[in-house]
């Protein structure tokens, strides 16, 4: 009976490690990128007259959102993602999420900016994102490429709504176009 429990525990641990290394191995390749919707920032859109230069005028992460971002970063590291190149939208809620993932410095990337205020820019924005991905997958080496962005950007890229803090493991072609994806719900 005791031996069965040990064997069961070892099997569970092996399955977990296989799953963990699968994510990190995929992210080391040039075929996969990880898109993340910023962590919880209650509300929809931004207040009237917001400014991208002034975080106080924007919708921002609350304390739960900050905790979510830290936890996601820790979870990714437990999955074997140790070395990552992180890019963020210019919005403060995305920059804060990127910083709290704790992979070192992140870079602001215009191709990740929200087009929520002008949905007519969806296709143009998605093409910019694809071009950005195409350029980065050629030069990232074995670093994971993590992009923190917005609901509308991810919806346009993959066609599915995701919640705050959720991630998408996206398989892409050399042009940065989506081939397939796996939704990774925000770990809790």
Name each region found by the language model.
Residues 1-3:
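N-terminal secretory signal peptides that target proteins for export/translocation
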């Amino acid at each position: 009976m005791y031996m069965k429990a040990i064997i069961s525990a070892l099997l569970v641990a092996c399955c977990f490690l296989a799953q963990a290394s699968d994510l990190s191995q995929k992210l080391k390749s040039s075929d996969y990128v990880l898109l993340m919707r910023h962590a919880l920032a209650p509300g929809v859109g931004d207040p009237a007259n917001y400014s991208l230069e002034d975080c106080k005028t924007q919708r921002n992460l609350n304390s739960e959102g900050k905790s979510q971002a830290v936890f996601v970063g820790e979870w990714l590291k437990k999955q074997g993602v140790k070395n990552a190149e992180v890019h963020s939208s210019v919005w403060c809620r995305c920059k804060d999420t990127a910083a709290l993932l704790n992979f070192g410095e992140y870079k602001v990337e215009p191709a990740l900016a929200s087009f929520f205020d002008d949905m007519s820019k969806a296709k143009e924005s998605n093409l910019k994102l694809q071009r950005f991905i195409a350029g980065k997958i050629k030069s990232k080496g074995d670093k994971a490429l993590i992009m923190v962005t917005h609901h509308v950007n991810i919806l346009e890229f993959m066609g599915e709504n995701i919640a705050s803090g959720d991630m998408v493991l996206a398989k892409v072609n050399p042009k940065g176009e989506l081939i397939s994806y796996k939704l990774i719900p925000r770990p809790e």
